[in-house]
Amino acid sequence: MEVVAPRTEDEVRAHLAAGKLVEGLQHMSPEYLKGIRRILTVSADTELVSAPAYLRAAAHAPALNNFGSAVSIIQDELAHAHIGYRLLGDLGVDMPALIYEREASAFKYPYAFDIPLDSWYELVLANALYDQAGFVLLSDVHQSSTFGPWKRALAKVDKEETFHLRHGRTWVKKFAADPDHKAKLQSSLDWMFILTLEWFGLPDAQKRHGIQLEYGFKGKTNDELRQDWMGHVVPFMDEVGLRVPAHFDEASQRYVIDCPFPQQFDSEKKEWGGVEIGWDEVMVRWKGRGPMNETYVAKLQKGYRG
């Protein structure tokens, strides 16, 4: 039977206006419940699918101890996914059905994870780019969330994501200091940077954030979060001598993207077309998923499905 949140929208707004956290269904309205379920699902799905994505690339680790570091990160990601799914279970969601019985295309996570990571270079860049995106998003939720159980759980998640970032940045610095490694790193960065720019979703001009911001599902808009991410990534890449199509504009005090965005992407070749397209075309690509979607989800569901 569907769990019904008992509060009205006005009661929830009054509860939040008083500075109180939402601790469970007893404090939720149907609209709040729908929203928090959605953001928890996106978060948990993202953490879960990162595991097979990272494991694929970890096979290219240069040494056994490096493989061990990658596996430690994967274990963290699975634990983070468990937090999200466990909270969804508390909110009336059938966890086994959600994880093991959904079709692959129904999973909600950034398109970037549908593109295979085929080298150690791409794994450490994923730690430096994708995990930075995750850190920006979850730090915003940690600071702004009105859902108490998740807010408290994210204190641990933030600390572990810092390790993932450090792992990626340490390797990027090491590779960038060697001309041969740097060239291979740059080749992967060329497709991964722009793909991570998409991570934060539609631009503010095309997306309404009303309920998300009002109910504290997030504290910043998509464009603000994208700016935060560039604020971490662009200076770092400049520091190590890697090229990214973005720079800080002193006049506007904002980061500016120096390439057509969004643009066409060839998921098989991992190449950008260089021609600007509309966000409606990007949405078609996102909804159609990418080449690894079914493979990764099948791997995650294999033990359950037999």
List each language-model region with its residue ranges:
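Helix-loop segments that flank and shape redox-cofactor active sites
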Residues: 50-72, 134-150
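Conserved alpha-helical segments that form or flank metal/cofactor-binding pockets of metalloenzymes
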Residues: 2-11, 73-101, 168-173
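Extended, helix-rich structural scaffolds rather than catalytic motifs
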Residues: 183-306
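Alpha-helical scaffold segments that form or flank carboxylate-/histidine-based iron centers
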Residues: 32-43, 61-80, 123, 149-161, ...
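Glycine- and acidic-residue-rich phosphate-binding/metal-coordinating active-site segment common to enzymes
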Residues: 144-196
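Extreme N-terminal leader/anchor segments
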Residues: 1-28, 32, 293-306
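Internal, conserved structured core segments that host functional sites
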Residues: 115-167
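Acidic/His metal-coordination segments adjacent to aromatic residues that form catalytic metal sites
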Residues: 21-41, 101-127, 144, 178-179, ...
